[in-house]
């Protein structure tokens, strides 16, 4: 369990950082008032949870001693605390504010953008000096920032990409959440066997029928090879889920069997796998 404090200049990417850490399992709180942070840390210590708190110029007092007192108070707790500071070059911050046309948080002090950035830099100096990690976001994308954060905290939590295999029937429409869709309607169809028609791809007679088909074996082999080739790149792309949809006409036989086979294969490779049969779920709801 640990408390991660994200701070840094306005416009340096703190919102991106919070979303990235939320995706890897942290409980995230944006702009928690400074006096409440020790209370949150105490709660986390008792509950065994980890959390991320963002501190920016809106909830940081102008007195540097307040920040030092907070850090000293946190050091007395059993929970581990880390500070990640996001920095960025002044000219890049000016350009980002110009592009988004947003107001700097200190603009309400009747300061120009440049003066607001400089004042903020002074006020954040105590956190900058105490930071465990400093990330310069001047020349990196939001995906690269997220990957840097994941790399820093990998020893604490490394949430694997969850691969969802789902079968569906084309006659019910394409699943909206699919990243990849594979059409297996060209494969031999158990539907035309009167004995197999009322069954599903989860039942042994249908499994036996499909396992005898060379085309089915070839499709499974080539599909899993394709996925294995690109999975490393997908895992590095800051994803939480990868949804792979397998579709046949009714979503009852071929797609169910193939989704099951692919799921079992990737489970055997220690991947985090979930399986879902959309059309079977619809059919079950109609019956019940």
Curated annotation (Swiss-Prot):
ATP binds at residues 8-15. Signal peptide: none annotated. GO terms for molecular function: ATP binding; GTP binding. It comes from the Bacteria. It holds the Pfam family RapZ-like_N. GTP binds at residues 56-59. InterPro entries: P-loop_NTPase, RapZ-like, RapZ-like_N, RapZ_C. Keywords: ATP-binding, GTP-binding, Nucleotide-binding. Displays ATPase and GTPase activities. NCBIfam families: PRK05416.1 (NF003828). Belongs to the RapZ-like family. HAMAP family: RapZ_like. This is Nucleotide-binding protein APP7_0339.
């Amino acid at each position: 369990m640990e408390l991660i404090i994200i701070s840094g200049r306005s416009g340096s990417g703190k919102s991106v950082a919070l979303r990235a850490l939320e995706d890897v399992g942290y409980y995230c709180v944006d702009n928690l008032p400074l006096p409440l942070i020790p209370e949150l840390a105490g709660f986390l210590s008792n509950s065994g949870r980890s959390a991320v708190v963002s501190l920016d110029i809106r909830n940081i007092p102008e007195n540097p001693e307040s920040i030092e007192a907070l850090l000293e108070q946190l050091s007395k707790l059993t929970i581990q605390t880390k500070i990640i500071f996001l920095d960025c070059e002044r000219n890049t911050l000016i350009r980002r504010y110009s592009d988004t046309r947003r107001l700097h948080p200190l603009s309400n002090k009747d300061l120009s953008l440049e003066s607001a950035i400089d004042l903020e830099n002074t006020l954040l100096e105590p956190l900058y000096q105490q930071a465990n990690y400093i990330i310069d976001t001047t020349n990196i994308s939001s995906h690269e920032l997220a990957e840097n954060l994941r790399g820093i905290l990998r020893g604490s939590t490394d949430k694997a990409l969850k691969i969802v295999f789902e079968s569906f029937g084309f006659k019910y429409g394409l699943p909206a959440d699919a990243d990849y869709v594979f059409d297996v309607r060209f494969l031999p169809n158990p539907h035309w066997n009167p004995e197999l028609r009322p069954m599903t791809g989860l039942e042994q007679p249908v499994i036996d029928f499909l396992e005898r088909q060379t085309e089915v074996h070839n499709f499974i082999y080539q599909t899993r090879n394709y996925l294995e080739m690109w999975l490393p790149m997908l895992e590095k792309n800051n994803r939480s889920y990868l949804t792979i949809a397998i579709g046949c006409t009714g979503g009852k036989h071929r797609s169910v069997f193939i989704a099951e086979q692919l799921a079992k294969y990737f489970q055997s490779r220690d991947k985090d796998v979930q399986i879902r049969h959309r059309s079977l779920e619809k059919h079950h709801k109609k019956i019940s």
